[in-house]
UniProtKB/Swiss-Prot annotation:
Role noted for this protein: Catalyzes the NADPH-dependent rearrangement and reduction of 1-deoxy-D-xylulose-5-phosphate (DXP) to 2-C-methyl-D-erythritol 4-phosphate (MEP).
Short name of any one Pfam family annotated for the protein: DXP_reductoisom
GO BP, one annotated term: isopentenyl diphosphate biosynthetic process, methylerythritol 4-phosphate pathway involved in terpenoid biosynthetic process
Gene name, Swiss-Prot/TrEMBL: dxr
Positions that bind NADPH: 12-15, 39, 116, 118, 193
Chain residues that bind 1-deoxy-D-xylulose 5-phosphate: 117, 143-144, 164, 187, 200, 205-206, 209
The keyword Secreted appears for this protein: no
UniProt catalytic activity: 2-C-methyl-D-erythritol 4-phosphate + NADP(+) = 1-deoxy-D-xylulose 5-phosphate + NADPH + H(+)
Protein's name in the database: 1-deoxy-D-xylulose 5-phosphate reductoisomerase
GO MF entry, a single one: NADPH binding
């Protein structure tokens, strides 16, 4: 079988490094390029171990190796992808900057493995337009969307996304407001980056995933349900018209959906999972415990509000992790920022989306400053 070429965007992050783990175990894909932001030490290690000859740097660091092709700056990812035109691009870039990375990947790759949430949340209309133009394969990497991708049928009654409930799922509502960063970062199931772990505790990440599912599977909001599933074994399910439910059950290991996206439709051998005596529980999220999640109904039909929601969360989570606001302040920053964007016109271009994002960042920062000054 001919080797396919791969570029990993965000190679030094959580999904990026787990993608590298898969490549060590399974043959058939050759890594030809990576991007990273600032983790120079790990980037050097990856380049050496995988004999990578192409590197895009989005941060302000120097990569000194005359044998490597290096692209730097805000357009480094687009320029590298245009030069390499890989068979597969793994978009593991986190944050809003992932939108540009996804669009460039769709332009220059045959398959895009999508592990960036913001691209569909904020720019789903742009991603779908590019998909239609280029005919690129788009395969989700998030465990929930990978699960739905695997069991989806032409007619479904409901799609069910599962959630862990985050580190505070068993806390009393009266105490959640004052949870510390070290409390919130103790995720009960997954080992993830700091922001997504906080987003799990607020269930903002699940709000993102509902919006992603609407875009990926062209589903109406009403057909998507979210259930808190403590065991972390069921990643997604579809309820069929005849009463059957199809679900994907596997250990909480991101290498499974990563390998599925890379090698689809072939399944590669990882570690087998054997059925045993287990119980599976499913609960509805509590609006009092997860108020930010329940803002979904307000934002679902507006890319402007969705973009503002994401930007406000980005600012609020950073402020919480730095000890500037309480955990309960995250929801308040998001809610107050959204108030400023009610009735805002729908974006039509990438520039429109980026303008809304940066406006929302500024507004959220002002709200955060106010909350910080009130010791909230």
């Amino acid at each position: 079988m001919e080797e396919r070429t791969l570029v990993i965007l965000g190679a030094t992050g959580s999904i990026g490094t787990q993608t590298l783990d898969v490549l060590k175990k399974v043959k058939g894909i050759r890594l030809i390029g990576i991007s990273f932001h600032s983790n120079l030490e790990l980037a050097f290690k990856i380049v050496k171990e995988f004999n990578v000859k192409n590197v895009a740097i989005t941060g302000d660091v120097e990569f000194e190796d005359s044998s490597i092709n290096v692209w730097k700056g805000s357009h480094s990812i687009e320029e590298m992808l245009e030069a390499l035109k890989p068979d597969i691009t793994m978009v593991a870039v986190s944050g809003f900057s992932g939108l540009r990375a996804v669009l460039a990947s769709l332009e220059h790759s045959k398959r895009v493995c999508l592990a960036n949430k913001e691209s569909l949340v904020c720019g789903g209309f742009l991603v779908k337009k590019k998909l239609k133009e280029k005919g690129t394969e788009l395969i989700p990497v998030d465990s929930e969307h990978s699960a739905i991708f695997q069991v989806m049928e032409p007619e479904v009654e409901k799609v069910v996304l599962t959630a862990s409930g985050g580190a505070l799922r068993d806390w009393k509502i009266s105490k959640i407001d004052r949870a510390r960063p070290e409390d919130v970062l103790k995720h009960p199931v997954w080992n993830m980056g700091a922001r997504i772990t906080v987003d799990s505790a607020t269930m903002v990440n699940k709000a993102f995933e509902v919006l992603e599912a609407m875009e990926l599977f062209e589903l109406p909001f009403e057909k998507i349900e979210v259930k808190i599933h403590r065991e972390g074994l069921v990643h997604g399910a579809v309820v069929l018209p005849d009463g059957n439910v199809k679900m994907v059950v596997s250990p909480p290991d991101m290498r499974i959906p990563i390998s599925y996206a890379l090698f689809y439709p072939r399944r590669v051998a990882l570690e087998p999972f054997f059925l045993r005596t287990i119980s599976l529980s499913f609960e509805d999220p509590d609006p009092e415990k997860y108020p930010a999640f329940f803002l979904l109904k307000e934002i679902k039909d507006s890319y402007a509000l969705r973009t503002a929601f994401n930007a406000a969360d980005e600012v609020a989570v950073e402020a919480f992790l730095k000890g500037r606001i309480r955990f309960g302040g995250i929801h308040r920053v998001i809610e107050k920022t959204l108030e400023e964007f009610q009735g805002y016109p729908q974006p039509r271009t990438l520039d429109d989306v980026e303008r809304i994002h940066f406006e929302a960042i500024k507004k959220a920062e002002r709200v955060t400053e106010w909350l910080s000054s009130t010791s909230y």
